[in-house]
Each structure stands twice: as structure tokens, then as C-alpha cells.
């Protein structure tokens, strides 16, 4: 399923699956399916601070990104998925990016991601997806720790 998650799945499971799908559609460079995971009034905040509002504009924005850039692929670790209300959930994760033609993450691209999902008409959609650079200013040990955790996750994914 590429357009959200059904009400049948437990909420936290459905939200984790929605997050998995957003990364998968990015990794496949599929702007259409990426945008369809958002609510019609959903918002995207990119790693560079760009803000895009609305499902159609998100799709158009990513079409341009994918046409003009060789985007790296994601590896991630979910740190939290919890309900904020009956039909609203929050997911937080750490993410690394593996540049094209490389087999290791680029630590300069590590990010903390936040996703707010809403259930509408029985389907989970993304209301907000935000990427924040994991700079950890003046705390290089945290940056190094995150990089090692993401590398371990990448190695695990490569094996399995």
C-alpha cells in the first residue's frame, strides 16, 4: 500500500509503516507515491529548511529534486512512535544518507526526522514531515555516536 495505512493496523504499527513508506518512496525516487503519503494539506520541511505545503506541491517539488539531483538513500532508526490523541501520532527518528555509488553514510547528512500523522477516513496520512540536520553543535561525541548507530543499522540492512 502506497497511499497511507488502514485503520485495521494498531496505530503505532501503522504510523511506523507510514514512515517506512516515506523513506522507501524517497529511496525509489518516486515523487508521486511520496506525495500520496501526505494529507492533502500536509507539509514538508526539508533538510535545507525549504517548506512545501500541500500534497500537489510536495509532489511537484520532489519531481524537480529527483530530476536534477542524484539523491542519496536513507537508513534510519525510529526512536519514538506514540499517539498524541485518538487520530494523531508522532514519530521521531534518526536518519543517515548513503550517497549514490557509495556504501557508507555521509555523516554530514545525518538528520533527526519528525513526522506527525493523522488518521482521516480510516487511513493514516502525513500532516508534517520535517528533516533537521543532526549537527550537535559543540557535542561531537553525539554526532559520532549517531553515525556509528546508523552505520550498524546500514550493516544490518545489508545482511538481511
Name these PLM-found stretches.
Residues 110-141:
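Short beta-strand edge/turn micro-motifs at domain boundaries
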Residues 86-97:
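A short hydrophobic beta-strand element
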Residues 12-13, 18, 31-87, 107-108:
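A solvent-exposed, acidic/Ser-Thr-rich amphipathic alpha-helical stretch
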Residues 97-101, 117:
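Beta-strand elements of well-folded, non-transmembrane domains
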Residues 38, 95-97, 130-133:
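Short beta-strand segments enriched in hydrophobic/aromatic residues
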Residues 1-40, 144-160:
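Short, low-complexity N-terminal intrinsically disordered segments enriched in polar/charged residues
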Residues 76-78, 90-92, 126:
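Hydrophobic residues on conserved beta-strands that form the core of alpha/beta folds
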Residues 46, 92-93, 119, 128:
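Residue-level recognition of conserved beta-strand positions in structured domain cores
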Amino acid at each position: 500500500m502506497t497511499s497511507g495505512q488502514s485503520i485495521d493496523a494498531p496505530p503505532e504499527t501503522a504510523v511506523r509503516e507510514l514512515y517506512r513508506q516515506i523513506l522507501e518512496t524517497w529511496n525509489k525516487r518516486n515523487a508521486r507515491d511520496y506525495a500520496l503519503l501526505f494529507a492533502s494539506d500536509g507539509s514538508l520541511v526539508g533538510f535545507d529548511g525549504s517548506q512545501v505545503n500541500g500534497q500537489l506541491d510536495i509532489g511537484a517539488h520532489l519531481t524537480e529534486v529527483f530530476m536534477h539531483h542524484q539523491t542519496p538513500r536513507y537508513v534510519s532508526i525510529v526512536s519514538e512512535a506514540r499517539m498524541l490523541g485518538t487520530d494523531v501520532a508522532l514519530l521521531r527518528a534518526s536518519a543517515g544518507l548513503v550517497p549514490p555509488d557509495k556504501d557508507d553514510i555521509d555523516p554530514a547528512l545525518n538528520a533527526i526526522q519528525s513526522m506527525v500523522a493523522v488518521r482521516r477516513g480510516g487511513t493514516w496520512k502525513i500532516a508534517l514531515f520535517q528533516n533537521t540536520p543532526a549537527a550537535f553543535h559543540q557535542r561531537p561525541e553525539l554526532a559520532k555516536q549517531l553515525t556509528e548507530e546508523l552505520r550498524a543499522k546500514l550493516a544490518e540492512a545489508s545482511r538481511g
